[in-house]
C-alpha cells in the first residue's frame, strides 16, 4: 500500500497518462514539479529530481546519473545517457523522490522514475489504437500510429503486443543552395535539395 511507505512517492495511472497525452520522456518530466529533464539531444537526456545533479562534464570520474530510469524492473540509465522512450500502453509511472540507493543502487541518489507497462490479462480480449497527424507550414507532415492488443491464450496464459510507427516531419529549410569554399574553390551544389 502506497500509504504505508515512508518515502515520497507519486504514482500516475493509465487514465491520467492518456488524459495528459504523455508520449515521451518530456511528458513524464511534466508530471511532477520535482523533476527536471535536461534534453541534451537524441539518446542523451538526463533526469534530475529535486535539483540533484551529477556534476556533468565537470565530474572527472564520469557523470553517473543521479536519477535512475526503470522500464518495469529493468534499469535503463547509463553513464550520461537515458534512452529515448516512446511511452505507450503504460499501466503507471511511479516517481520516487529522495535517495533510493539502498533499494535500487548507486544511480538513485536523487530518486527513481519507474515506467510500468501493462501486463497480459487472461480474462479479456482488449485492443485499441491511436492516430496522430500534423503539419508545419512549409514542412513535411508528422504522423504516428500506435496500437496494442491483449489476447487470452487459455485459462492461464495471455499475450499482449504493443507497437508504434512515428515520423517527425522536418521544418528546417536548406536555404543555401550552393557553397563555394574560398581557399580551395571547391563548390558544393545542393540546389536539388534546397
Ranges and model annotations:
Residues 65-66, 88-94, 100-183, 187-194:
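Outer-membrane beta-barrel translocator/receptor signature
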Residues 1, 18-19, 35-37, 55-57, ...:
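Short beta-strands and strand-coil junctions in structured, solvent-facing domains, enriched
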Residues 1-20, 45-48, 67:
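N-terminal periplasmic "start-of-domain" segments of outer-membrane beta-barrel proteins
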Residues 3-5, 59-62, 80, 123-128, ...:
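Short, charged, solvent-exposed linker or helix-capping segments at domain edges/interfaces
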Residues 19, 26-29, 84, 103, ...:
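A general structural signal for stabilizing positions within well-ordered secondary structure
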Residues 58-60, 66-99:
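Short acidic/polar hinge/loop motifs at secondary-structure boundaries
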Residues 9, 26-74:
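Extracytoplasmic beta-strand/coil segments of soluble accessory domains associated
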Amino acid at each position: 500500500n502506497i500509504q504505508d511507505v515512508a518515502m515520497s512517492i507519486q504514482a500516475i495511472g493509465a487514465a491520467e497518462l492518456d488524459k495528459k497525452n504523455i508520449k515521451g520522456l518530456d511528458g513524464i518530466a511534466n508530471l511532477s514539479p520535482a523533476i527536471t529533464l535536461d534534453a541534451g539531444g537524441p539518446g542523451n537526456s538526463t533526469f534530475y529530481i529535486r535539483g540533484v545533479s551529477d556534476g556533468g562534464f565537470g565530474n572527472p570520474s564520469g557523470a553517473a546519473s543521479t536519477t535512475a530510469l526503470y522500464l518495469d524492473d529493468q534499469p535503463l540509465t547509463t553513464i550520461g545517457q537515458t534512452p529515448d522512450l516512446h511511452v505507450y500502453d503504460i499501466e503507471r509511472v511511479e516517481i520516487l523522490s529522495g535517495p533510493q540507493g539502498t533499494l535500487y543502487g548507486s544511480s538513485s541518489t536523487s530518486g527513481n522514475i519507474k515506467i510500468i507497462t501493462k501486463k497480459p490479462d487472461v480474462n479479456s480480449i482488449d485492443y485499441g489504437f491511436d492516430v496522430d497527424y500534423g503539419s508545419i507550414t512549409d514542412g513535411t507532415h508528422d504522423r504516428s500510429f500506435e496500437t496494442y492488443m491483449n489476447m487470452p491464450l487459455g485459462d492461464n496464459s495471455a499475450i499482449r503486443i504493443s507497437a508504434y510507427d512515428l515520423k517527425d516531419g522536418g521544418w528546417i529549410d536548406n536555404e543555401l543552395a550552393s557553397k563555394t569554399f574560398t581557399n580551395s574553390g571547391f563548390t558544393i551544389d545542393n540546389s536539388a535539395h534546397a
